[in-house]
């Protein structure tokens, strides 16, 4: 299982342009299966970008907790499925209510979308 984060604005823009968007109640997910050359040459299989807006919550502690929850969810989903061998990139943008929702419900929703579209 090899997951790395998107590092700069250029990488985020590439995934936004190449990816397909899915709008859910608690998050927006952008998945790109066709990756540019810079990603294909990498040793990592999964590229993850997380955008947590200050509009979501003013406190940095809460925003960081949301990021930790998302990273943990992705680790669970990628390790439990056939996604280990597939190279793909995704961006997750949480919406209002993300921090209050049950972890198992988030896991179910996110894994259903990812597994269906990869």
Curated annotation (Swiss-Prot):
Pfam family, one: Ribonuclease_P
Coiled-coil segments: none
Keyword list, A-Z: Endonuclease, Hydrolase, Nuclease, RNA-binding, tRNA processing
Catalytic reaction list: Endonucleolytic cleavage of RNA, removing 5'-extranucleotides from tRNA precursor
Record has tRNA-binding as a keyword: no
Keyword hit for Zinc: no
SUPFAM superfamilies listed in its UniProt record: Ribosomal protein S5 domain 2-like
Uppermost EC category: hydrolase
Gene Ontology annotations for the cellular component aspect, listed alphabetically: ribonuclease P complex
Annotated Gene3D superfamilies: 3.30.230.10
Similarity remark: Belongs to the RnpA family.
Quaternary data: Consists of a catalytic RNA component (M1 or rnpB) and a protein subunit.
Function: RNaseP catalyzes the removal of the 5'-leader sequence from pre-tRNA to produce the mature 5'-terminus. It can also cleave other RNA substrates such as 4.5S RNA. The protein component plays an auxiliary but essential role in vivo by binding to the 5'-leader sequence and broadening the substrate specificity of the ribozyme.
Full protein name: Ribonuclease P protein component
Natural source organism: Rickettsia felis (strain ATCC VR-1525 / URRWXCal2)
């Amino acid at each position: 299982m090899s997951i790395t984060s998107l590092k700069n604005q250029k990488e985020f823009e590439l995934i936004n342009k190449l990816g397909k968007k899915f709008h859910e109640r608690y998050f927006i997910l952008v998945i790109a299966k066709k990756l540019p050359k810079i990603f294909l040459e990498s040793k990592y299989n999964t590229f993850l970008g997380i955008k947590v807006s200050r509009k979501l919550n003013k406190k940095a502690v809460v925003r960081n907790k949301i990021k930790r929850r998302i990273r943990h969810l992705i680790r669970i989903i990628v390790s439990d499925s056939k996604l280990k061998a597939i190279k793909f990139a995704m961006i997750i943008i949480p919406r209002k209510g993300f921090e209050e929702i049950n972890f198992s419900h988030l896991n179910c929703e996110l894994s259903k979308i990812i597994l269906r579209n990869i």
